[in-house]
Amino acid sequence: MPDLLHDTQNVYHLFPIIVSEGKRDALHNYLEQNGVGTVCHYPIAPHKQECYANAEWNTPLLNLPITERLADEELSLPIGPSISFEDASIVVKLLNSFF
C-alpha cells in the first residue's frame, strides 16, 4: 500500500491488479470460494461496449490493444480504508497460495 502523509487518511476504494496468462477468472473464482469478493470493473473494453457502438470516434480502424488487454486481465481486490489488517493478510495469503 502507498505510504500516507502525516495527519491524512486514505480514500482508496479500488485496488486493481493485473492477472496475466489467462488466470484472472480462475483467481476471481478461487477468491470467491474462499470468501473474498472481487470485481472486474471493465470486463468489456469501454470502446467495445454497446453504448459506444455508434460513437463518432468508434470506427473500425480504432485499435486500443492495451485497453483490451486490461479488460481481460484487471481484477480489483477488496482493499480500502475499511478493511482490517487481518482481512488484508487473508487476501495476501490467498493470493500467495494461488500463485
Where are these regions (language model features)?
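PLP-dependent aminotransferase class I/II
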Residues: 1-99
